[in-house]
Curated annotation (Swiss-Prot):
EC identifiers of the protein: 4.1.1.39
GO biological process, one term: reductive pentose-phosphate cycle
Organism, as annotated: Brassica oleracea (Wild cabbage)
Cofactor: Mg(2+)
Catalytic activity: 2 (2R)-3-phosphoglycerate + 2 H(+) = D-ribulose 1,5-bisphosphate + CO2 + H2O; D-ribulose 1,5-bisphosphate + O2 = 2-phosphoglycolate + (2R)-3-phosphoglycerate + 2 H(+)
Protein name: Ribulose bisphosphate carboxylase large chain
UniProt key word Cell cycle: no
Amino acid sequence: MSPQTETKASVGFKAGVKEYKLNYYTPEYETKDTDILAAFRVTPQPGVPPEEAGAAVAAESSTGTWTTVWTDGLTSLDRYKGRCYHIEPVPGEETQFIAYVAYPLDLFEEGSVTNMFTSIVGNVFGFKALAALRLEDLRIPPAYTKTFQGPPHGIQVERDKLNKYGRPLLGCTIKPKLGLSAKNYGRAVYECLRGGLDFTKDDENVNSQPFMRWRDRFLFCAEAIYKSQAETGEIKGHYLNATAGTCEEMMKRAIFARELGVPIVMHDYLTGGFTANTSLAHYCRDNGLLLHIHRAMHAVIDRQKNHGMHFRVLAKALRLSGGDHVHAGTVVGKLEGDRESTLGFVDLLRDDYVEKDRSRGIFFTQDWVSLPGVLPVASGGIHVWHMPALTEIFGDDSVLQFGGGTLGHPWGNAPGAVANRVALEACVQARNEGRDLAVEGNEIIREACKWSPELAAACEVWKEITFNFPTIDKLDGQD
């Protein structure tokens, strides 16, 4: 031991266990523009004060450990430690608190969502002093945002590539999701694209199974794309799922898609992982491919209100990691999604600058400093009667994706696509004429049925279908 170390240790080191709040709860701290800010929903164990719980989160997700260690004296903890700088009670919840934590930027590797999450949502979520812990929101500072490429292309570049403006894009997930041969799969793709859809999609668990290997699927889907483009005069695409068991295999599939000349590939970003996703996003930008992102596994992480991570955080992470589309719920369909909360993270996906708005679950003002935006995808249990609400809720910069709502049409796949396209065009025209889609939506659809027997048949099939279940993850203060 050197004399310098020995002297410092003799006056500054005291072995033992300290309360976290002595070092990591700093209500006087003024946050910096370069700090990453986090809002955690903390549920302390009985007998643990909220200040101690918040400080424990700050410590265990940054520089702290359970006891004082000698090597604390070899660095500047004041420079590197996370700080719990504010705690507030959650309305209507006696045992829950929002703990705000500031992290110095130097704690994180540049351009790495993987490293950021390993710290902020790592081992701390298993900490015994906490009964539950949920990350509600993150503020990503411009200094860190600028280290990421972000989406391969973004909303405006995608519209320019497709030459489609002034309306939402239309998609369809091919069903049944598993079991079709590659040729029959390609036939369904062709029929949907010919009928008027912009995109069709591999389901998230379509990779390369014995009944349909990936290369065969890619070839038949490419044939469907080119044939439908020739017949309609519109640019078409199919989300070819490149997700695979290894990053090398994923890239092989993306390269083959590029060689086929198709416009877009797909990745399951949570099951595939952020490192793989960021690599694929970089490849897509370099090679002119759009990237569709599916969020399979998200509800394991985000559905419970008191533990895990809200989807708005996963949405921000995806915008950093890279993707041109991401599934975002529907509000009106079969999947979980509170309206105000959904609109909040939809804005976080699309807009350059989003103000703090607790009524929509947004805890921090977020400045994306020109990072390209991501198109939200509404998908899951939607049909033609939902079209006015979807158009009103999501606006033009979105993808409305109907699986069963296309392929379940009584006359077949192409008429199902026609019905959706007619319904969308009717809603966009009515909106542009100043009509209120929220009030007149059903009337607008009925009027369009007079000119489209395909739409009339679809309306008859799905007139009674609803998904009336309460939302589990509501915003605080809602009954």
